[in-house]
């Protein structure tokens, strides 16, 4: 059997599969279905300085080959995440976990990251500058190289753990933003978050989502996400975590050939809670089929 392990910023993962933030809760919920220690790691629910109740309902709309969501970063706030959620997580997950942090000001990001950084179970901090669902924050940082850089510099001053910046695809030039984050000190880049989309209820003649618009994800976005991962990984020297419409072991191999060191799986978890388990179990078959002896060796292998 081929070697599935990869090294992400100094930490060895048994495999490159990472459930994406917002699709896997705080992990322990999924441990009732299967042993989540088979995962490379996972990115837990997006955490903010203060508790957030999220957007009004309805928050989810189905689409052909995908879905739109506008949950709005619902979470109990960083203090409760540390005091209540992480203890439940560490009882069942015995590897380093990826924290996911959002904010509505540079100070918010720094405050939350500084607190999360002190937790032993956290191996990486994924700084989400790309959430498209919250008015006045999140997305505005990720659509400007200057604003994204400012967040990265502030977070790097107060943390010791690797910082991975999660980018929005809803920009004119994602490569410019990735390079700006690298220059500001980011240790890695993850991309892409969801694409901004909407659906209209023909009977009511109103948007299906109460927030009007939300993040479109699912298999339909995979080719666009793959292209962006390829472009960014060829433009920066830091590791890239690829995501966007990944739903099979073949998709994972494509992402890695495009330049991803590890691969996040998002919407597929909402369709099938066993999605990541199935992908991990199928990887050896796909590796054998395409004569891949080591996943680490194929990173960026597409010319």
Language model: regions and residue ranges:
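A short, charged, Gly/Pro-tolerant segment at domain boundaries
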Residues: 296-303
């Amino acid at each position: 059997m081929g070697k599935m392990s990869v090294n992400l910023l100094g930490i060895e993962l048994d495999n490159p599969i990472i459930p994406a933030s917002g699709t896997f809760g705080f992990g322990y919920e999924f441990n009732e279905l299967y042993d989540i220690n088979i995962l490379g790691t996972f990115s837990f629910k997006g955490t903010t300085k203060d508790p957030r109740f999220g957007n009004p309902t309805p928050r989810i709309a189905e689409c052909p080959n995908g879905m739109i969501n506008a949950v709005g970063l619902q979470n109990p706030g960083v203090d409760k995440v540390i005091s209540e959620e992480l203890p439940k997580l560490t009882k069942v997950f015995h590897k380093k976990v990826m924290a996911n942090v959002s904010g509505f000001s540079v100070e918010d990001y720094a405050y939350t990251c500084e607190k999360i950084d002190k937790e032993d179970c956290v191996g990486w901090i994924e700084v989400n500058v790309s959430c498209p669902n919250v008015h006045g924050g999140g997305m505005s940082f990720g659509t400007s190289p200057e604003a994204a850089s400012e967040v990265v510099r502030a977070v790097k001053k107060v943390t010791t753990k690797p910082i991975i910046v999660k980018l929005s695809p809803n920009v004119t030039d994602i490569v410019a933003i990735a390079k700006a984050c690298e220059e500001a000190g980011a240790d890695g880049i993850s991309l892409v978050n969801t694409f901004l989309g909407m659906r209209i209820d023909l009977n009511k003649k109103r948007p299906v989502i109460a927030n009007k618009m939300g993040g479109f994800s699912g298999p339909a976005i995979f080719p666009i996400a793959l292209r962006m991962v390829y472009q960014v990984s060829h433009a920066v020297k830091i590791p890239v975590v690829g995501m966007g419409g990944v739903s099979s072991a073949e998709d994972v191999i494509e992402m890695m050939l495009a330049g991803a060191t590890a691969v996040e799986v998002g919407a597929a978890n909402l369709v099938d809670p066993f999605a990541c388990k199935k992908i991990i179990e199928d990887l050896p078959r796909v590796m054998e089929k395409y004569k891949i002896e080591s996943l680490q060796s194929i990173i960026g292998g597409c010319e």
